[in-house]
Amino acid sequence: MALLQISEPGMSPAPHQRRLAVGIDLGTTNSLVAAVRNSIPEVLPDEHGRALLPSVVRYLPNGNAHIGYKAQDEAVRDPKNTIISVKRFMGRGVRDVANIEHSLYDFVDAPGMVQLKTAAGIKSPVEVSAEILATLRQRAEDSLGDELVGAVITVPAYFDDAQRQATKDAAQLAGLEVLRLLNEPTAAAIAYGLDNAAEGIYAVYDLGGGTFDISVLKLTKGVFEVMSTGGDSALGGDDFDQRLLCWIVEQVGLQPLSAEDSRLLMVRARAAKEALSSSDSTVIDAVLTSGEIVHLTLDADTFIQITANLVQKTLTPVRKALRDAGVGPEDVKGVVLVGGATRMPAIRKAVGDYFGQQPLTNLDPDRVVALGAAMQANLLAGNHAPGEDWLLLDVIPLSLGVETMGGLVEKIVPRNSTIPVARAQEFTTFKDGQTAMAIHVLQGERELASDCRSLARFELRGIPPMVAGAARIRVTYQVDADGLLSVSARETGSGVEASVSVKPSYGLADDDIARMLQESFQEAEHDMKNRALAEERVEAARLVEATTRALETDGNLLSADERAAVDELMANVSEIAKGEDHRAIKAAVERLSQGTDEFAARRMDRSIKSALAGKKVQEIG
């Protein structure tokens, strides 16, 4: 009798039919789509054979939009309606966008994510990104000849929850099923690791148009373990262009510039930067709207000089990522360069000097992320051949915690924890009869809630009334493979439950992430003192309240002198708790606890006698 083969649920394609899935690199400057054909990943070109799609969208008064090269060509004459580098705005509020006052766009002052005023109406970064994704989806379906079942879309490793959610929302608008959000450095490691059968510790240095990521990975026998991540999602090739634009303006004395002239000179600056990747000098020519002619010669040494601090700025997260991973530059077997901006000779030299080795450049830095994403998409779609499996172990960049009494933070998921991850911890009530609990979800490394970033708040209601400390509330944090967080709280006795999917209105800037981490190191001792003070104050308040309730019900068990002594101890605790010395508060609490031991014993005796009153020996036990 023939044996029937049974595949995992959702992993079995129809006989002789492949499930079409693609990898998409949604970049700041350019975007790409790739797929696996005949077991080989390849970038899918447009009808003109071009692999890259400029991440540019121009909106027209009739509501239509031009995407890609056509929009890029129109950017100079219509700068306000031509949206470039929209990835920098994803999941960001107005206050999070760097140099917003110098932007060419008309921003709308609205709550939540930043909005852009265009000829076709007000557009969000999610809508702009959806136009780019829809174009890539159509390109893939035309090239592959059928509809897609889904896509793996790459994001910077340092994208926070809001930025990741915005990316998923854009994909949904574009009609794409997201199989996975994959960190860009991890995608590059897949492409390199599987191509070269590499093992060991690798660093992925990813400098794109608008973002910078550094990841330290350990590759062993098909397992990709991310040991640490770092970066800055507001630093990229665009910043080198901006620095060069400022140099041009200073050389010619052109202030102020019209929007059209700014965009024209930015285009010339980018072209000059790219030219200097393969030559020692270049000429910048432009005719402004006033008729003024710009003619400058720029040599490589000058460009290196005016952008040197940007190059050095990338090395700060590199040092920290290595420190977090517990390794040094000498332990790194290879350095993978990702992103078009890594073509700059100054970048390659700085990376090579720091790690003491030539970085790996045998794969096109513009394409490597899309190729790795395509391989992961092919795996998730169930098209892989036996032996092509691999395991990704990614991490979260910042700790996740919950606020407890006294404004303290209890960390539930530490930073650099491997995802997906689920962690749970039990908490209890503070007061007798408490029937609700407020859950405050936080992100950061500090000890006090006021120093961390608030992600969400929700309430667990319906807790059965009990004495303080009797209820057991289990709080569970779940971070999925896309890095998105959900939190649930459950009272274990009654089963009452509440949950929230964390969707902040806008994201956490990576300057904030870096600042939060730096502050956590600098303020560690101060934070621990504050935490100890808050903990002792909470314990003091709890003991005073419990003693007060006990005196109300059983105060007649004490003589007048004993009652006066307890009252004095309580007053002493309350007074000392107003101070800043946590050791003094702890000592006062211990004195009150010891001073009420005899009272507690008498209460216990009374309780036992009351419980046994009127019962026969046979009825007990």
Swiss-Prot record:
Xref: InterPro entries: ATPase_NBD, Heat_shock_70_CS, HscA_NBD, HSP70_C_sf, HSP70_peptide-bd_sf, Hsp_70_fam, ISC_FeS_clus_asmbl_HscA
Gene3D superfamilies: 1.20.1270.10, 3.30.420.40, Actin, Chain A, domain 4, Substrate Binding Domain Of DNAk, Chain A, domain 1
Annotated TM spans: none
Pfam hit, one: HSP70
GO biological process assignments: iron-sulfur cluster assembly
GO MF assignments: ATP binding; ATP hydrolysis activity; ATP-dependent protein folding chaperone; unfolded protein binding
Keyword annotations from UniProtKB, A to Z: ATP-binding, Chaperone, Nucleotide-binding
Its job: Chaperone involved in the maturation of iron-sulfur cluster-containing proteins. Has a low intrinsic ATPase activity which is markedly stimulated by HscB.
Family to which the UniProt record says this protein belongs: Belongs to the heat shock protein 70 family.
Protein name stated in the entry: Chaperone protein HscA homolog
UniProt organism field: Cupriavidus metallidurans (strain ATCC 43123 / DSM 2839 / NBRC 102507 / CH34)
